[in-house]
Amino acid sequence: MIPRTALSALLYASTSFAVCTKLEDCPQFEALKTDECQTYHHFLARGSTSPYPGHVIETVGKVCNALNTKENPKACGYEDVQYWAMNGGERWCISSHEGAMNGAEQMRNYTARCPDSHLIVMGFSQGGSVALDVLGGGGGPLWGCTQEDNPPMNISSAPGSKGATLIFSQLLGLN
């Protein structure tokens, strides 16, 4: 279970509006990108057509600022969920499925290497859909295409039992 401090940091950070999307435009966050074992490790799923790491990097920075301490300055970091991040019909379905499969595999690999880490999954826009599909399974018809199925994570075992999720999205189709 992630301690209250981490959850408080997540909730606090979720109120910020992220504007930095490209890592080269945000050098202050470069040190957070790692695949090394950490106490808290984010998996970021960017929005459609966004560059890596995407819209949630500033939120990750705030969360990590709250979790990194003098005693453990590298307690928190992130890695990008690797996927195409494209929109529009069939491209969305292919991209989302790729993200869900890759995100789940990245989390499994990380947990195998770093079994004591707490996992935080963050997604924005299409990345929010990818994050939900990673954790809960996905697939089916959407916007004129059919996304291939992917299985949900087992919440009784790692990595499914080790995560917290934060999704940023927009409501679609509301008039």
Model regions and ranges:
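Glycine-centered flexibility motif
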Residues: 2, 47, 99, 136-139
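Intrinsically disordered regions, especially transient/low-confidence alpha-helical propensity segments
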Residues: 8-9, 81, 140
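Active-site catalytic motif of lipid deacylating hydrolases and related acyltransferases
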Residues: 21-118
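Conserved beta-strand elements of beta-rich interaction domains across eukaryotes
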Residues: 13, 49, 171-172
